[in-house]
């Protein structure tokens, strides 16, 4: 984060997948109104974060394929991102669908394996996913419809209604 530490310090031991996750998490945290980001936005955020002297060649392919839960693994099998539309990604959340071959795959960096100053992102992610699940439940159209037809059955029990419909059937 550029905000997390000195730009003079180049960190070389962070995995490419973790670097992609960090950049995407930062985008989500900085732009809470955005549901997803373009591949280019994530690449640019990786560049801006400058965890390495140069952009590593694997960053793009991790964003496009290796980290994407709902794509077939080829060969990377992380579940760190979700493809929301062509060319669009967001962080993976528990409950998102994923390719069966990615079962059990890594979804977040281990806090001990990311650069100092970024550990708070893992805690932020835990809160973000919890809130996202709550929002999904609160905004689910089927769950919102619960009880909406109650007034239709105030005069007649459902079993009586079915019996009445079946009258005259042979």
What are these regions (language model features)?
Residues 167-170:
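Short hydrophobic/aromatic patches at helix-to-coil boundaries
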Residues 35:
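Flexible coil/turn residues that form the inter-helical turn or adjacent wing/linker of helix-turn-helix
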Residues 26-31, 49, 148-152:
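Alpha-helix C-capping/helix-to-loop hinge sites
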Residues 23-27, 38-52:
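DNA-recognition alpha helix
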């Amino acid at each position: 984060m550029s905000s997390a530490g000195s730009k003079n310090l180049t960190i070389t031991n962070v995995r490419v997948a973790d670097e992609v996750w960090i950049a995407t998490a930062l985008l989500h945290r900085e732009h809470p109104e955005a549901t997803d980001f373009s591949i280019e936005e994530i690449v640019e955020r990786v560049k801006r974060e400058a965890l390495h002297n140069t952009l590593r060649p694997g960053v793009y392919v991790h964003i496009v394929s290796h980290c994407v839960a709902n794509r077939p693994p080829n060969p990377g099998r992380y579940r760190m991102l979700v493809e929301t539309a062509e060319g669009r990604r967001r962080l993976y959340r528990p409950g998102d669908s994923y390719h069966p071959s990615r079962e059990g795959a890594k979804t977040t960096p281990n806090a001990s394996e990311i650069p100092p100053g970024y550990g708070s992102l893992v805690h932020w992610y835990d809160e973000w996913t919890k809130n996202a699940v709550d929002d999904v439940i609160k905004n689910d159209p089927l769950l919102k419809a619960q009880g909406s037809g109650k007034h239709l059955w105030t005069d007649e029990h459902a079993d009586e209604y079915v019996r009445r419909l079946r009258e005259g059937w042979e």
